Design a protein with these regions (language model features):
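Beta/alpha (TIM)-barrel catalytic core signal, keyed to glycine-rich beta->alpha loops juxtaposed to Asp/Glu
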Residues: 1-196
Length: 196
């Protein structure tokens, strides 16, 4: 990202009221801080950071981005929280993604490695009367993020909203994170970078 080039271009738009808030996506901590410095010189600030964040991809947390956002009043919007459906509990080795699709190519080779995590999402969901997708979403909320959830059905909207009411225990969060790490599945896409 060329923060030095694009950030100044946003300043006149913000000052004229043509944009209400400024956010960045797929930026590491150094880039976020530098964009913030440039904006601060003009009395502006970053309002949101949007990065890939899920039980399988936590590099924004490990890099200190989540903490930085909390400390500076920046909303962290987590995308791919459900890993394009891989963490919904709907897919496993017996029920893979359709062959020949991007999701099938990305996740089908790893469904076995994801089995323990998916089982834990089901188990925790049973305790909270929630689906695995709701548990994965509740985890992202527990980490202080605002999850971006892709939906195609009204039921999915209702389930996503209900996830905000689920309060996971520290022990549940820890179990999920341990299994996410142990799965060892790299879900980074070609347009993304590691944040660490």
């Amino acid at each position: 990202m060329d923060v030095e080039r694009w950030t100044p271009d946003l300043i006149p738009l913000a000052k004229r009221g043509q944009i209400e808030a400024i956010g960045v996506s797929n930026h590491n901590l150094a880039e976020i801080k530098r964009a913030g410095e440039i904006l601060a010189e003009e009395g502006l600030k970053i309002s949101a950071v949007q990065n890939h964040f899920s039980l399988l991809h936590c590099s924004s947390e490990k890099a200190g981005i989540l903490d930085y956002c909390k400390e500076n009043g920046i909303t962290f919007c987590a995308y791919m929280v459900l890993e394009q459906g891989a963490l919904t509990g709907h897919f496993d080795t017996d029920h893979p993604f359709p062959e020949g699709t991007g999701r099938g190519e990305a996740y089908n080779p790893h469904l076995e490695e994801l089995a323990a995590l998916i089982q834990e999402l089901h188990s925790i969901g049973a305790v909270h009367q929630a689906s695995p997708a709701q548990v994965a979403t509740a985890w992202a909320i527990a980490k202080g993020t605002l999850p971006i959830i892709g939906v195609t059905k009204v039921r999915q909207v209702e389930e996503a909203a209900a996830a905000a009411q689920i309060v996971l225990s520290d022990e549940e969060v820890s179990r999920l994170e341990k299994l996410g790490d142990e799965a060892g599945v790299d879900t980074l896409r070609e347009w993304e970078k590691e944040m660490e």
